[in-house]
A protein has these predicted regions:
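Conserved CoA-thioester-binding segment of acyl-CoA-metabolizing enzymes
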Residues: 1-56, 89
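Catalytic-core regions built around general acid/base machinery
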Residues: 40, 83-95, 101
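Glycine- (often His-adjacent) and acidic-residue-rich active-site loop
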Residues: 35, 49, 57-90, 106, ...
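Terminal peptide-recognition signature
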Residues: 18, 22, 37, 55, ...
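A general structural signal for well-ordered alpha-helical segments in protein cores
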Residues: 69, 84, 144, 153-156, ...
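Terminal low-complexity tails and localization/encapsulation signals of metabolic enzymes
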Residues: 1-4, 246-262
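Crotonase-fold acyl-CoA enzyme core
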Residues: 92-203
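C-terminal long alpha-helix characteristic of the crotonase
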Residues: 121-126, 177-226, 234, 239, ...
Length: 262
């Protein structure tokens, strides 16, 4: 298993817990961290033991505080948005489910990182938002594109144009996060969801579903239906179909009567 400077990777029982380990810098995004995001996701993609990834921040105050402004030189300012977008898009394109465990503030690039994940479990004490416009900037890590897809066009405009942040209750109400709970229970809640609702599902079915749903809004309905048909026909091998049947019967004994029929 590779070593990392900015991340802590722990693997157990199908879960890979990935912790941004820059608490003295509010777990902000620098080039080294984004490079290691790509490296760890490449490693976990081929790790058969990893079924679900949980991403969180070290400490209790910050999930991720956005871009590390100490690296904001004229030269890095030209390349950082594209470099950051590539790293965040890696989470979106990663073929296994990723849960953002938002244990603290997720501001700017931290919010953009969270919305690049598949699910967001948020501490009741945390805040989330894209305040870049308050500083004459924009959420250039994919926020202008992903946020409308999650909360709708009107709400995304409000949040991006005003730069205001949200508490957990409002984030839940608008569909920005999946669930909220006290910080002390947050990781356990996310792990329980992963173990009970994701790990029992067939690998190929989850990865294919993620691909199809993620790309659904990128095409018109007719193109999407054709893409769905082609993808499902080409990605399910006989072995994977057998795994799907086994997973279904384990998660719900009622399926045994269906799949056992000759």
């Amino acid at each position: 298993m590779p070593d990392f400077e900015t991340l802590i990777l722990e693997r157990k029982e199908g879960l890979a817990r990935l912790t941004i380990n820059r608490p003295k810098s509010a777990n902000t995004l620098n080039r080294k961290l984004m490079q290691e995001f790509n490296e760890v996701l490449d490693f976990l993609e081929t790790d058969r033991d990893t079924r679900v990834v949980l991403l969180t921040g070290a400490g209790e105050r910050h999930f991720c505080g956005g871009a590390d402004l100490r690296e904001a030189t004229p030269e890095t300012a030209k390349n950082m948005p594209a470099f950051g977008r590539d790293a965040l898009t890696h989470f979106e394109d990663f073929p296994k489910p990723v849960i953002a465990v938002v244990n603290g503030a997720a501001m700017g690039g931290g919010c953009e990182l969270a919305i690049a994940c598949d699910f967001r479990f948020m501490a009741e004490e945390a805040k989330i938002g894209v305040p870049e416009i308050l500083f004459g900037a924009l959420p250039a890590g994919g926020g202008t594109q992903r946020l409308p897809r999650i909360v709708g066009l009107a709400k995304a405009k409000e949040l991006i144009f005003t730069g205001r942040h949200l508490g957990a209750q409002e984030a839940l109400a608008i569909g920005l996060v999946t669930a909220i709970c006290p910080q002390k229970d947050l990781m356990a809640r996310a792990e329980t969801f992963a173990r009970e609702q994701l790990i029992p599902r067939a690998r190929y079915a989850l990865s294919t579903a993620k691909l199809l749903v993620t790309r659904a809004l990128d095409m018109d309905l007719a193109s999407g239906l054709a893409f769905e048909r082609r993808t499902i026909m080409t990605m399910a091998s006989p072995a994977e179909m057998a795994e799907a049947r086994e997973a279904a019967m384990k998660s719900n004994p009622a399926y045994q009567n269906i799949f056992s029929k000759k």
